[in-house]
């Protein structure tokens, strides 16, 4: 079977001799470092290929409205990525000119590690060859299951004590017949074959014509597209008189209460009309009139929110073109969840506790996991995982504000059944109201579920958005910019707070308001540059 490996020529050439750790790696907090110091210690590779033992390799760049270019770079040691080593350079220089510049005006954030040569030496000659062994051992835990999309990345892992280790990041996709898929992911010690950390990386939660139809559920009320909300954008094939629940931006797939499906859009017969407006009809399911209509509309709103407010695609293809949002509805049997799997959004129809999960807020949440994945890449465990979840909750409130001009400050309130005993899944004004989430960073402990650690940044967002002269849009402006230009995959709550301050400064917003909001949730900004 073919597996995906991520290696550079230098990595293979230098795989010569593994040694035991001698001392801890030395972290450099980049917001307090000088650009000249970093250039002396690390070769800057703007082509993404490591050319020296200690290097920073280009990942992506983004130029904001202030003409500042934010260049993301992954640390590599002898060609292998360093997990936790990540830099973002902020200057008037593009990535191509950054390596040659001598300017002291380059600002930075992130963390990189020096001293890896002393601690690690060179990897053993079998390090690369043993990558498949690590993957197969990890895969063996899921024997007799439907496994695919296997990946292994040889790397350097920095643990919580700043000890560096040769390691492998392994992941597989496990498809189930009776429940949602999983993406078990782990970082494995190359010496002991034991995991340092592990988590599930599935993030939960033709000719154009117009469509009319119904949406909503018993709790939020029912409404009509073409009357209460805009007409739906459809595609019609005149040759076979068929309309498709698809447009350039969004495609809706009917899972028919199964766990796998074809990739074709939902369709229905539609004879020619004088107005070129076609009734989608509706398929009532668990108290909702038409989950497919709601999904198509939610995708439209979310995509346009990111475009109208920020001039960016909510999701992009590898060539930078807009990615069509794929919304899979009627998923599974009694499935009370929704998730983003790296390619598409999937929505269950609920059961006893929930109505179908195709509300605007839930859709914005799942789609925005993809936005985070394509920008900061916040890892989905620990404090960065809480930030990842929280950004998607923020996006849910932003989508409500974009659509109806106000935010509910509840997550999932519109889909919870009255008989469930719950009025929402999470609360941004007081996260601890759900009995599990934390309100402040000093309440965090290792192993806390990311849906509960999200309370810190959810609370921060609410406090900031409700300050005088602020609103949901303005607060989301700050968080989007922090996600795009300042957060790294490994950001902690405090490091993320520095990114929020930097984003607010770039946008010309009140730093005192941001600082007081950070302080209210016990995020320490004293070390921010």
Swiss-Prot record:
Q: Which cofactor is recorded for it?
A: Zn(2+)
For biological process, the GO terms are:
proteolysis
| Root EC class | hydrolase
Q: Which residues form the propeptide?
A: 25-204
Q: Which UniProt keywords apply?
A: Hydrolase, Metal-binding, Metalloprotease, Protease, Signal, Zinc, Zymogen
Q: What is its EC number?
A: 3.4.24.-
Catalytic residues (positions): 366, 451 (proton donor)
What does the record note about the cofactor? Binds 1 zinc ion.
Q: Which domain of life is it from?
A: Bacteria
> Coiled-coil ranges per the record?
none
**PROSITE patterns from the entry?**
ZINC_PROTEASE
Q: Which PANTHER family match?
A: BACILLOLYSIN (PTHR33794:SF1)
Membership in a protein family: Belongs to the peptidase M4 family.
Q: What name does UniProt use for this protein? A: Zinc metalloproteinase MspA
